[in-house]
UniProtKB/Swiss-Prot annotation:
GO biological process: chemotaxis; defense response to Gram-positive bacterium; innate immune response in mucosa
One Pfam family cited in the UniProt record for this chain: RnaseA
Species lineage: Eukaryota, Metazoa, Chordata, Craniata, Vertebrata
Residue positions of the active site: 42, 155
Gene Ontology CC terms, in alphabetical order: extracellular space
EC assignment: 3.1.27.-
Protein name in the entry: Eosinophil cationic protein
Encoding gene, per UniProt annotation: RNASE3
Modification 3'-nitrotyrosine, positions: 60
Domain of life assignment: Eukaryota
Length: 160
């Protein structure tokens, strides 16, 4: 049986709609600049256990984020990494605005262990501490960002 064109178009629209919803779930809350949202998601000098640390992110996103990495360093240190040599981003090879840290930093990687959680208050995470290099994508600052840093980290691409 061959699907009719109309049915195929409806299915395609539904699929694209679902992909759009999934994409919007990962979107930055509009009240934050890219750098501010990066700091909320990835900078925490002394993060508590993952289940507690992830509550802030999950409250903004209204969902249980599958995984996240907290760099146990300062925003200033991470912004200075943006001065390092520019490289192609390892995870997103189409981007050429990444920079690798020169030193390993302590970090805390969080993995969601109950992906079927119906409520963000019940999200539970496994903690994986470590010490690694990291790669960030950087961009010129938004006018709402501090003028102290002309180029700011906006995306944690990977840890090495």
């Amino acid at each position: 049986m061959v699907p009719k064109l109309f049915t195929s178009q409806i299915c395609l629209l539904l699929l694209l709609g679902l992909m759009g919803v999934e994409g919007s779930l990962h979107a930055r809350p509009p009240q934050f600049t890219k750098a501010q949202w990066f700091a909320i998601q990835h900078i925490n000098v002394n993060p508590p256990r993952c289940t507690i640390a992830m509550r802030v992110i999950n409250n903004y996103q209204r969902r249980c984020k599958n995984q996240n990495t907290f760099l146990r360093t300062t925003f200033a240190y991470t912004a200075n990494v943006c001065r390092n040599e520019r490289i192609r981003c390892p995870r997103n090879r189409t981007l050429h605005n990444c920079h690798r840290s020169r030193y390993r930093v302590p970090l805390l990687h969080c993995d969601l262990i109950n992906p079927g959680a119906q409520n963000i208050s019940t999200c539970r995470y496994a903690d994986r501490p470590g010490r690694r290099f990291y790669v960030v994508a950087c961009e010129s600052r938004d006018p709402r960002d501090s003028p102290r840093y002309p180029v700011v980290p906006v995306h944690l691409d990977t840890t090495i």
